[in-house]
């Protein structure tokens, strides 16, 4: 019997629900691109029940399991009322739990992992044809994700993966076990995708990897990441380049120089600290110490005095003492972060930290967490207040300001990554997402800036034109390029339709 595709009958609708890090956000763009290439249509907000719901899951946080199974339970009545509806579960939790998902939620139709996203359309068809769940988990990549089509969510900003997987062995992290060892894309491949996005009107690109500073080791060039940043500087129309996440143990001076000397590379750095205690860092197997971390920040600020530095911090790691925690506060005060993502330690089965002695009581972790948040907010507020009266360039965004409709403001990101809510003034109705505005900061809060005066300048952009027309950038798959920074891209055909930070 010949299997039919979704496009062979009336178009089926889909919805992707994403949990977790930027890797998952970008993977979800590829999932959407695959489904649309196979003939599915994205479900609108007003649609009753999508024909296919895909959960792209995270396995890093402790409540990831509860969140997934709670949402699956909420969908069961809809599935019972609509027998043709399909539910698929992918991502890191699917890679970890595998057939356990179907055992706990037998109404799930497809389970796929982090290494075989491209198989999703075929698995959906097979499950529908056989009226049985399809569970397919691979231990390594079947195709590099860059070969898959992508439906981008933003007209003005895009993610570009430079690598997948991770070679580090942090004791709290399950990501390497779920996404595998690091595999690097060739620079020519990365630059081809960046150029394709810019050709679609995208102004800002974020280079994405579990550890961007180890990029190039696979093909024998430990300075490849700095070269890649400089090569991005040669792409006409690319106004902003960001990257996430670097690892302090691999951070080199050539990257700092590339950031400082390449005009379109933003002076913003997100570099996870995790802990300020050397003893805790050793237990985490982080391979650097607080002195090195602060030394990198000192070099970054010497080269770029306006740099905004953000971080990740874990509180309550097994064995963390009060003295260890105080050392973390000391490093936070010295580093003066412009923002910090703070987390209470979450025990993940399968990680070395999960079986360590001296797991801390929840009340102790909560109390330290609250003190850390208070310390961070005091510093970020002070750092933001220094910008009152300064002119900032804002790339206008969608969905950044939760109160924009009530306040009448628009929102976007400054070049250093800070969130800015601004008054459009006499330009109300003319400024679109993707446009660029220059405005003056009038107020600072711990997590954002306000600019309530008349904008000083407004520049219409191709990204704004695309947003106004309701277009979304769609990029075909990009095949592996040559291991030479700046190598001219070769034409590539579209991919066949059958096809978290350290």
From Swiss-Prot:
[4Fe-4S] cluster 1 binds at residues 21, 58, 92. It is found in: Cytoplasm. Pfam families: Radical_SAM (PF04055), UPF0004 (PF00919). The keyword Iron applies. It comes from the Bacteria. Residues 385-455 form the TRAM domain. It catalyses: N(6)-dimethylallyladenosine(37) in tRNA + (sulfur carrier)-SH + AH2 + 2 S-adenosyl-L-methionine = 2-methylsulfanyl-N(6)-dimethylallyladenosine(37) in tRNA + (sulfur carrier)-H + 5'-deoxyadenosine + L-methionine + A + S-adenosyl-L-homocysteine + 2 H(+). Catalyzes the methylthiolation of N6-(dimethylallyl)adenosine (i(6)A), leading to the formation of 2-methylthio-N6-(dimethylallyl)adenosine (ms(2)i(6)A) at position 37 in tRNAs that read codons beginning with uridine. PANTHER family: CDK5 REGULATORY SUBUNIT-ASSOCIATED PROTEIN 1, MITOCHONDRIAL TRNA METHYLTHIOTRANSFERASE CDK5RAP1. Monomer. Belongs to the methylthiotransferase family. MiaB subfamily. This is tRNA-2-methylthio-N(6)-dimethylallyladenosine synthase. It comes from Salinispora arenicola (strain CNS-205).
């Amino acid at each position: 019997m010949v299997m039919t595709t979704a496009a062979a009958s009336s178009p089926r609708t889909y919805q992707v629900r994403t949990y977790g890090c930027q890797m998952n956000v970008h993977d979800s763009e590829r999932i959407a691109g695959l489904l649309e290439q196979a003939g599915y249509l994205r479900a609108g907000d007003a649609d009753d029940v999508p024909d296919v719901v895909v959960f792209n899951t995270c396995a890093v946080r402790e409540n990831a399991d509860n969140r997934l199974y709670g949402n699956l339970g909420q969908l069961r009545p809809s599935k019972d009322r609509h027998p043709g509806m399909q539910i698929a579960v992918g991502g890191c939790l699917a890679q970890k739990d595998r057939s356990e998902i179907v055992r706990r939620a037998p109404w799930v139709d497809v389970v796929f992992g982090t290494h075989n996203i491209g198989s999703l359309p075929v698995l959906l068809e097979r499950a529908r044809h056989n009226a049985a769940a399809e569970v397919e988990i691979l231990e390594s990549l079947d195709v590099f994700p860059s070969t898959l089509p992508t439906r981008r969510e933003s007209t003005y900003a895009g993610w570009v993966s430079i690598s997948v997987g991770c070679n580090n062995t942090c004791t709290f992290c399950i990501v390497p076990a779920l996404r595998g060892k690091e595999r690097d894309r060739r620079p020519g491949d990365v630059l081809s995708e960046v150029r394709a996005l810019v050709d679609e009107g995208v102004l800002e690109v974020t280079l994405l990897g579990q550890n961007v500073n180890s990029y190039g080791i696979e093909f024998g060039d430990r300075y490849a990441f700095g070269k890649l940043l400089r090569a991005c500087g040669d792409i006409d129309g690319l106004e902003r380049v960001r990257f996430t996440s670097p690892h302090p143990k691999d951070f080199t001076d050539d990257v700092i120089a590339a950031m400082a000397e390449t005009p379109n590379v933003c002076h913003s750095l997100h570099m996870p600290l995790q802990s300020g205690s050397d003893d805790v860092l050793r237990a985490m197997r982080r391979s650097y110490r607080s002195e090195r971390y602060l030394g990198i920040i000192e070099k970054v600020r010497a080269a770029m005095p306006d740099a905004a530095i953000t971080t990740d911090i874990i509180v309550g790691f097994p064995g963390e003492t009060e003295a260890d925690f105080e050392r973390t506060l000391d490093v936070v005060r010295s580093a003066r972060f412009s923002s910090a993502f703070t987390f209470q330690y979450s025990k993940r089965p399968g990680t070395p930290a999960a079986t360590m002695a001296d797991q801390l009581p929840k009340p102790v972790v909560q109390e330290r967490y609250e003190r850390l948040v208070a310390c961070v907010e005091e510093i970020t507020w002070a750092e933001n207040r220094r910008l009152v009266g300064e002119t900032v360039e804002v790339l206008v965004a969608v969905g950044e300001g939760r109160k924009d409709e009530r306040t009448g403001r628009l929102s976007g990101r400054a070049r250093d990554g800070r969130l800015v809510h601004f008054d459009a003034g006499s330009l109300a109705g003319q400024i679109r997402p993707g446009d660029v505005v220059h405005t003056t900061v009038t107020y600072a809060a711990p997590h954002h800036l306000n600019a309530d005066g008349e904008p000083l300048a407004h520049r219409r952009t191709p990204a704004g034109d695309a947003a106004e027309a309701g277009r979304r950038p769609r990029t075909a798959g990009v095949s592996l390029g040559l291991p030479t920074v700046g190598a001219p891209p070769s034409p590539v055909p579209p991919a066949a339709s059958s096809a978290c930070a350290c």
